[in-house]
Amino acid sequence: AFIELFTSGSTGQPKQIAKPVISLDQEANMLATHFADRLLGCRFVASVMPQHLYGLTFRIFLPMALGLPLHAAMLWYSEQLAALSHTYRYAFVSSPAFLKRLDLHLTPPPVEMILSAGGMLPWQDVEKTSTWLNIWPDEIYGSTETGILAWRYRQQDNIPWFTFSDVHLSQESEGVRVFSPLIPAEGLVLDDMLQFNENGQFHLIGRRGRVVKIEEKRISLVEIEQR
């Protein structure tokens, strides 16, 4: 069985990507192994849609892999997040666009873990989120094509990305090639440009193609020019 997703890729043309359900299960199990202790006893709530791979993996497949309850309703506003019952503890699956609009005047809910992906989370928004919820966000890096690649937990600005177990990155002439159990054995070349340190961790330094990200959405400059 497959789930079909669409992404702009590096060309700007919509590209259909068929994700085997078994691959989504495997990705969720990788995440469960990595985060299980910190997610113990949490309920999942989210401000991201499950129509995208990030929302599908973290909002649906991950809590299922851990046997944890998930909140079906979307959280669109800070007020909905603040209104969550204090009877439970929550894992909040969110995005930079939502976190930068948090209302710090509201009463914070008992969030045990914040996950953010889909785009870069500016440092000032990391600090703001931590100030309100008293916890630092876990940032996730990946793509629809590759699945999860890396994560970081920033308590200061310049923290690099760390790859997940079984994910390997190789600098080649055409770009950085990723090898992962979630994709074909020959690997995939990333659209992003990475700068590695001596320990194999990395920073994101830009993109190769004419596709930019604005509030977690891939925007094709080619498509805009053709309109």
Can you describe what each PLM-predicted range is?
Residues L104-D157:
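Gly/Ser/Thr-rich phosphate-binding loop
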Residues E4-I17, T144-E145:
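Conserved adenylation A10 loop of the ANL superfamily
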Residues T7-S10, F44, L56, F92, ...:
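Conserved S/T- and glycine-rich ATP-binding loop of Class I adenylate-forming
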